[in-house]
Regions:
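The feature marks long extracellular or luminal low-complexity segments
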Residues: 1-248
Length: 248
């Protein structure tokens, strides 16, 4: 507005934000803890301004994501200077998302979690075998539970069965690394098939129990031929059977 005496006139002038000083003013996580299924996304919002805090529309922001996560390499700010960034992953854990423009950079961490809906027995390994069939000494197995993309799943309940009269806990729970050890005892010598399952996923491994020589005993002694001639040649015969304390 210009004025003199009682005379004045006004005109509008426009100042525009300075794209030369474009910077990442804010980078915030707006959704976190998405499932690591390659489809569900964590989201962030970036805001671009000039050096004096004026919002900048139509600016190209470069984006990178760590730990195997997927993100569009560039995004463009809207009229308010903000832009939403969507990040997906098939790898559970933390992903560092970095947004940059000119020489201005900001980073935030987002977290992807394993998908319990696709829990499966990834492997079942015998870690101790050939235990004595005394009902106390145990064969051991280790099961590992993951989601469909191989991410470890903690706190999952695994069902367990053992054949040939062996004894095991009916359920076990996985540790933070997705594994759990399974103890199996038996009083019956021989092979026991141990089966673990979760959802529709099942694996089996055989373990072997051996008779306990420490408790060897004569279980029975039977005459199988008697009344032979006393000629020093013809023999009477008997059959002895030796077992451990549990009849193995």
């Amino acid at each position: 507005t210009a004025s003199i005496n009682n005379s004045s006139q006004s005109r509008d002038v426009t100042f525009i934000a300075d794209v030369r000083t474009a910077q990442i003013a804010v980078l915030e996580v707006t959704q976190d803890n998405a499932v690591a299924d390659g489809a569900m996304a964590n989201t962030l919002r970036a805001r671009v301004t000039d050096a004096f805090g004026n919002t900048l529309a139509g600016q190209t922001v470069s984006v990178m994501a760590g730990n195997g996560a997927t993100v569009a390499p560039t995004v463009i700010t809207g009229q308010d200077g903000t832009v939403e960034i969507s990040v997906t992953s098939q790898t559970a854990g933390t992903s560092a998302v970095t947004a940059s423009i000119n020489s201005s950079t900001a980073s935030r961490n987002v977290t992807f979690i394993a998908d319990v809906r696709t829990a499966q027995i990834a492997d079942l390994v015998v870690i101790k075998d050939d235990s004595v069939a005394d009902g106390a000494m145990a064969n051991m197995l280790r099961a590992r539970v993951t989601d469909a993309f191989g991410n470890a799943l903690a706190g999952q309940t695994v069902s367990v069965m053992a054949g040939n009269g062996a004894t095991t806990a009916p359920t076990v729970t996985t540790q933070p690394d997705g594994t759990v050890e399974i103890s199996v005892t038996s009083q019956t010598a021989g092979i026991s098939a141990v089966t673990v399952s979760i959802n529709n996923s099942t694996l089996s491994q055989n373990v072997t129990f051996i008779a306990d020589v420490r408790t060897a005993q004569i279980a029975d002694l039977v005459v199988i031929k008697d009344g032979s001639e006393a000629d020093g040649l013809t023999a009477n015969t008997l059959r002895a059977r030796v077992t451990d304390a549990f009849g193995n």
